[in-house]
Curated annotation (Swiss-Prot):
Functional description taken from the UniProt entry: Cleaved by the protease thrombin to yield monomers which, together with fibrinogen beta (FGB) and fibrinogen gamma (FGG), polymerize to form an insoluble fibrin matrix. Fibrin has a major function in hemostasis as one of the primary components of blood clots. In addition, functions during the early stages of wound repair to stabilize the lesion and guide cell migration during re-epithelialization. Was originally thought to be essential for platelet aggregation, based on in vitro studies using anticoagulated blood.
Listed name of the protein: Fibrinogen alpha chain
Gene name of this polypeptide: FGA
Keywords, ordered alphabetically: Adaptive immunity, Blood coagulation, Coiled coil, Disulfide bond, Hemostasis, Immunity, Innate immunity, Secreted
Record carries keyword Coiled coil: yes
Highest taxon in the source lineage: Eukaryota
Highest classification ranks of the organism: Eukaryota, Metazoa, Chordata, Craniata, Vertebrata
Description of its domains: A long coiled coil structure formed by 3 polypeptide chains connects the central nodule to the C-terminal domains (distal nodules). The long C-terminal ends of the alpha chains fold back, contributing a fourth strand to the coiled coil structure.
Localization (cell): Secreted
Length: 19
């Protein structure tokens, strides 16, 4: 995942969105 947008759901574990 990325450290940009909290979109995708992975932002809770990765720190960003999976976009």
């Amino acid at each position: 995942a990325d450290d940009s947008d909290p979109v995708g759901g992975e932002f809770l574990a990765e720190g960003g969105g999976v976009r």
